[in-house]
Amino acid sequence: MRRRTGPSSTTLLLSDGICCDGFIYKYLWDDLARMASVAHWNYRGHGRSANPADPERIGVDAHVADLDAVRREIGDPPVVLVGHSFGTQISLEAYRLRPEGVRGIVLLCGSYGRVTHTFKNSDVLANVLPKLSELATKHPRLTRALWSRVPPKTALRVALFTGEIDPRTVNPSDVEPYFHHVAHVDFPMFTRMLAAAGEHSAEDLLPSIDVPVLIVAGDRDSFTPPDLSRHMAETLPKAELVMLTGGTHVAPLEQHELVALRIEKFLTDHGLA
């Protein structure tokens, strides 16, 4: 975990997507620290965190418990939960677990759940993942070897070529660390974690969330189709939706200045910083 004390006692607690270790917050880290205190942590088996002692403890509930432990470790200050991608599910469930002290939520390019059923507006990933997970379990060394041998620069070029990230607005060097980190994440763990995320849903919680929520979405995000963000905005009692024109799943990097300004406005409007 890393932390920076800012001008406000409120702490913006940042959660990542699966296979991420903070690359998405490269610019927001400094921008947000000018508004409030900030803290960022790593999931089990990600970044500086070791692989889980129990390989089955990799579901949403385990990560939510870890986030709650982080809140207590930093002194249990008032927090605004900030989540990107899978981190939106974690932030929502962290509110369910212990809403006390949560003053607001910021959801970046993420959904309330069942992500493998909506990826690219299809359930293909949900159907393929069980066989992939079975293969990883039966042949862990083989799948780890194949997974780790995909050159990060090649993966980056594919993402740029296919439009999964916008080559006009993103600096490739901002995204390359993600592909380097992915190569070092344990593949069997990744498949189990993704499967758990794909079957989890916090949709039932949305109508009862009684704090301001900012939803930032990209209209070209194929990982989290924008209609899911619109649905969340319509269901949450105190939600604001910002739809970024041309934004993909890494919009916090592509349009980081606009995202920072919009978060600052949200925090100011609601007296959160």
Model-derived features with residue positions:
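Conserved hydrolase catalytic core segment
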Residues: 77-121
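Short beta-strand/loop motif that positions the catalytic acidic residue
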Residues: 209, 215-217
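Conserved HGGG/HGGXW glycine-rich cap/lid loop of the alpha/beta-hydrolase fold
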Residues: 2-51, 70-71
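Catalytic histidine-centered segment of alpha/beta-hydrolase-like enzymes
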Residues: 247-260
